Amino acid sequence: MILRRLLLAGSLLLASLAAAKKEGPKITATKFDHEPRHLFYFEDTDTVVFQHKYDAHISTDAGQSWSVIKGPDDGMVGKVKSIYPHPHDRKKAYVFGQSRTHWVTEDAGKSWRAFKIEQDIPRSGNPLAFHGTDSDKLILHTIDCSGFVCDMPALYTTDGFKSHKTLTKSQHGCNWAITTPEFGTQADLPEKIDNRVFCIFSGLHAPMGRNKRLLYSDNFFEDDKGFEVPLNNGRPVSDVVRLAGVKKFLVAAAKSPRTTEMTLYVTDDATRWHQAMFDGHKLENDAYTVLESTNYSIQVGVKTTGGFNPMSALYTSNSEGIYFTRNAEHVNSNHLGYIDFEKIAGIQGIFLINTVSNWEEIDNNHQRKKKVVSQISFDDGRTFHDIKAGDKKLHLHSVAQLHNSGRVFSSPAPGVVMGVGNVGDHLKEYDEGDLYVSNDAGITWSKALEDAHKYEFGDLGSVLVAVYDEGRTNKVSYSIDHGKHWETAELPHKIRARVLTTTPDSTSLKFVLIGTSKSGSGVEHSVIGIDFSNLHERKCGKDDFERWPARLNEKNEPDCLMGHKQFYSRRKAGSECFIGSEFKDPVPELERCKCTEEDFECDFNFVRSKDRKDCVPARALPVPEGQCKKPDDKYTGSSGFRLIPGNDCVKDGGIELDKPKERPCSDAAKEPVSGEIDVTKHFFSANKPAEYYYLERPVLSKDKDETIVMLTDKLEVFITRDHGKTWKETLEGKHVVKLWPHTYINDAMYFITGEKRVIVTKNRGDSFREFETKLLPNRDRLPVLAFHPDPERSDWLIWTGADNCGRGGDCHSVAHYSTDGGDEWHTLMRYVGRCEFIGKERSRKTDELIFCAQHENENPKNRHLRLVSSDSWFKDKTVHYNNILDFRTMAEFIIVAARSEKDSLKVGASIDGKTFADAEFPANFDVKVQQAYTVLDSSTHSVWLHVTVHNVEDHQYGSIIKSNSNGTSYVLSLNNVNRNNADYVDFEKMEGLEGVALVNVVANVDEVQKGAAKQLRTMITHNDGAEWAYIRPPAKDADGRAYSCSPGKKGTEECGLHLHSFTERPDYRDTFSSPSAVGLMLAVGNVGDHLTLKSEGDTFITRDGGIEWHSVKKGNYIWEYGDQGSIIVIVPEAKPTKALFYTLDEGKTWTEFAFSEVEMLILDISTVPSDTSRNFLLWGKEVGSGSKPGFATVNIDFSGLKERSKECVLKEDKPEADDYYLWEPKHPLLEDNCLFGHITRYHRKKPEASCYNGGDFERLHNVSTNCECTRQDYECDYNFERQSDGSCALVPGHQPLDPKRICTEDSKAIEYFEPTGYRRIPLTTCEGGLKLDGFKAFPCPNKEKEFEKKHPRLHGAGLFFAIVLPIAAAGVVGYYVYTRWDGKFGRIRLGESGSSGDWLSRDSPLIAIPIAIIAGTVAVLSALPLLAASLWRSARGWTPIGRSSRPYSSRGAFAARRGDYVGVVEDEDELLGAEDFEEDEEV
């Protein structure tokens, strides 16, 4: 048994003492100066191993004597870091060394073999993942750090570390499909499953390890990157956090985004997965524990209350691990997740639990002390009974309060159970308990010994051993009659017992006791061997055994479970003998029973009825083909029951609940599809909605409601659960003035009143709770509520209120915090500007990190703020910046804007919330402090800022600057970008697609500075702001007529597509794109030289990420995406209408649909934020004849439409086999689909497929191997600016950043690079190819030797021959070829279709290679003065080669693109592979 609770570690073997009392056990003590760790037995042997400081010690006589394991060549001495036994192979164990040498034994410690790896072993946790049936197969998790960056490679071996290979370079945990010996025992698993491996990886492009993915491979990821596991109805799931084996099941746990929910998925064949369904309960993050389970069910404890007094509910699954039934509530647990639940070893169906009797008091007051009571079940949790000692209730300390290693109550000894506890109303403290024993598997109990003791079982229960556990003792107690009578034996000296243990199967007569004792001023540790082998000479005979029934029913008769009765041959309590069958586990005798109701469970697709007597359909049932042609038909199907797999009851003469039965077709498939769109209109008396919010269900949630909370302009609160088909008014008379949704949890909504009272719902409006705040809402227009970003801290709140605001008062804002959802408030800080929690994901260490802006000198009249932080609720604080304007927490950065000493804008950035670095702005970019700034985005590993350059009302515009990957060094991305009076900017990132953004720029800057109206033009970037271009307009409008201007292949200043953007939207949630409709954008605009009035615009769509646009409707429409873009609805904006238009094929065709008999003015159209629903909601008013007063909502439901009635089929391993295809975004000027250095592939529904996408899923299929770098992977470096030809040049009068800074900032740096004017775009992952940065390296000061080792150079003769010999050889070959080649240069022969095929022909490698070398050399030499960094690097070295496919066919084609995306110098087309001549030049 592996130790769970040991205290100290160390090494120094001091002494060995032996003592033996006549007719008593043999006792031997060995002293150590540090306590042993990791003690375990090799099963079925007397061999024990433990770690003592940095040595491993071994005993082959059950602890009587000990020696140090030396290993091969004494290599293990003083080098041991950790020890792990193999859980499925009793002879194997693994010792990990302090360096990279480790050892394995395959003969229970008799010999050891060394093996080496090149990575380090993580400091915590077991690094090994074991195969369930092949002990030679293991996965080893390692860590490999370089500087501050660490990878987590996983290695694997199939021969027990005689050899090993890399499984994956980085992971968050890998495991075998077959994790336990029981897995797959009831299924015919294909051979490939034996090698199947599952790994959790970081999400593609997800920051900070978010959106983890579960992938599998059957060939150790050698030929592929693995396939995502189809956990959810055949589709992958993001944010998988754990994978574990439980008996015959594999269980995967996934987090639900923007909720505290956790979802479990279960499989019993590593292929087909099902979502675990819990009976009316949802799992919370880190709030469940998979308990000891059986071969036919999973036991799970689900935390129901947290805080200082956690409790859990106990659930048991059906045999497939899918449907879970609640067996017990209010089960006692601790803050570590340990739950008071334990099965009786070796006996099916019996387990003990502790429940909390005063759970209602605990719910109302978490400070109350729990009253814990013990119960026992003899029928697998169907019923529970009090534990009795005589006629009194007995309560026992269990798993939540461990006091020994191994199991708490029982061992493989049949029926013998012990525990420490007390009789009475509830469980008392441990030291108030006594030792109790049961001889009949827990039915009856009696007191064994006074006081609390540690205890163990030996010789299958023939010997019980106990040692006093309330203080020091020099005695050990033992019983040989099942605990009826006890004797004592003297220990060599007094000890404080720490661990008492024996062989895992409890068949031995030998025990090991570990204890501590005082030695002078220190503590010494004793490992004591206790041997009862010679206590009796007689071995038990046949008459000494009884046929003992393992379970008894209420009539005291042998009971049936899983179709059989269970009996053991057990030594009689009064027999004075020892069994002596060492290392032979007890084998039960099974007697089959007739089938009863208890032998059946609900069939698949069925769940228990509320009265638990029947099984009712859980969902629409599948119908045999050809049946149920009419709704009132019947068909023969499942009865709802099935025999529990593994149950061996006899049906003959018993109950048969699984006989097929006739069912009504109403139980079967859902209602026939109407083929039509459903419309539901609802009227409100108010004039308009003041605000509304969707409380969207996470994709993994079993509930599918579509909830909206709305506040009208009459301050009425309405809630709908069905997307606006029905509305219900709530919170009448509560004077709600503002809705405040939880920023991170979708289920929660806060209702702000005009008083100190706040109302909250955490279950989407099912129930409400009120709490009082200390102050009224603040008057400084600050957020009144701030939330903690970690889901498990969703009750942590910051309230910013107004204090001392009476007449003549010193009115200011004060922040209070609560950690219990508003029940108790504590002052956080006075005179604040704004406060925010910083989650542990960013701060890495603490949940309590908070940032606040506070008035300097706590003077509200002082407009100067300072940025402060604290991780102790501001008992202590750190001042980061003085004189700030404001701060923002973005996706990857914390950004602060402050005034510099020169009254200019100064920006600081932090990634971890601890260290800030000042940003360096581009040259000639001195921004006055009164100029506005806007943080635009920080989701692509860089910060985007818009800084206003011209700040006259209605005439504002400014520049977009973009940072490097740590947010400190900014470069100019684009000038003259439009901004409005509210500081919003015409800038929008395309959702779901990296690097694409649109802006509107002011075209007439000079006129605007003189007071003229702005003329706007739209520009787009496809490489994250490194380059911008005008949008190429479509050739024809929606009516098929050509536009008045035609730009050709690119947009120009005179002719482009210009779009109305962010600053003109009444609702900023209405965006061009949708995160779930990858590649699609809709917009209103016009074709011409600038943007005209919105009323004059038309509606356009793009399907390829903004490269090609199409005019879909004349006029101005508002739009919404549904079902992830498979349905798009548009409605005329600001124009009365009775009809909408929808498309099912991404805008290629449109269908008109009338939704109202009366004309309506539609103000907005909405759907769930993820755009995954087939329901839409129109918000508007009836106008004209027959109109009703007030405003109305109109639900448009497409789920009945025939073309959207069947769910699409997606297979990750065959992604284009059914209803989907793989789409690759691209850059408009690159021939291949490399974007940001890689090819990205997304799942997109085939437009012609008649099906619906359903719930949101991970659309990103994979990211291919990195591409070679091109110009589009670079942007201009700090103090460099883009020239008219696209190149980057130093700003006159300024210098680049000092490249030597890296040497002082990173102590491990050995070199720095000469600035080239270019830097890599933070998003890019390209490798090789065009290298425009870091071209020439120099050694850091005092790192010359390391630099020389990294960059060895040729000297002397070696350098001479390296230069001269290739030139001489080329000359000889060239002369020989010239004189003998039949093609000879300049020679033209008519009628020849190709080369002769001779070895000296033009296509011969002998000719082609020298020509390529010469041509490449000329090209490079001619380019060196212009662009020294323009070299192409291949995988073979530094050969100057081009890309596999040329982006341009001629110099003319290259030149034709100048002025848009070109970012190279004049002659770089030759480097990029342009042909030597124009296509129409004469030869």
Swiss-Prot record:
UniProt-listed PANTHER family: SORTILIN RELATED, SORTILIN-RELATED RECEPTOR
Domain of life: Eukaryota
Pfam families documented for this protein: Sortilin-Vps10, Sortilin_C
Keyword list, A-Z: Glycoprotein, Golgi apparatus, Membrane, Protein transport, Receptor, Repeat, Signal, Transmembrane, Transmembrane helix, Transport
Ranges facing Cytoplasmic side: 1378-1405
Topological relation to the membrane, as annotated: Multi-pass membrane protein
GO BP of this protein: Golgi to endosome transport; Golgi to vacuole transport; protein targeting to vacuole
Protein name stated in the entry: Vacuolar protein sorting/targeting protein 10
Lineage: Eukaryota, Fungi, Dikarya, Ascomycota, Pezizomycotina
Renumbered ranges of BNR repeats: 58-67, 103-113, 375-385, 436-447, 478-487, 718-728, 817-826, 1100-1110, 1141-1151
Cell location: Golgi apparatus, trans-Golgi network membrane; Prevacuolar compartment membrane
